[in-house]
Amino acid sequence: HDALPIWILPASELSIRFNELTPIETILQRYPTGLDDVFPLVGSDLRQPQLCLQEPTSGRKMTIATTNQSMVLFSTTGFEAPFSINGQAMHSNYGLAIEPQEYPDIVHHPQWGSILLPANKKQTYQTVYQFNLL
């Protein structure tokens, strides 16, 4: 069967400590080809966010809590497009896609659970986006 390549690294082997606030510039310097990666999440308590983004100049803060098992972070590194966002041309690293989801290759790893939806069975995933000021 065809499957996505899976590498599971201990957090200690990553060049970023995701349990500490790290400027996005620092992350992109350490990952010059950008992010397009799946990060496993610990816990699924919607009262405890798994991701926090802060912008100190404006004082904006966004947290995300989800019942999903992972989160994909995709930076727009190398992405150039002929359209504008907020009056500025789209350019590399202008955005960050945040995608709470189950593991992309979960169908080949039954130990991670299942995304199969039997007929007439309800399945719910929740994601909470909270916006505040610092």
Enumerate the language-model features and the residues they cover.
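Short, small-residue-biased leader/transition segments that mark boundaries at the very start
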Residues: 1-4
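Active-site pocket scaffolds in enzymes
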Residues: 11-134
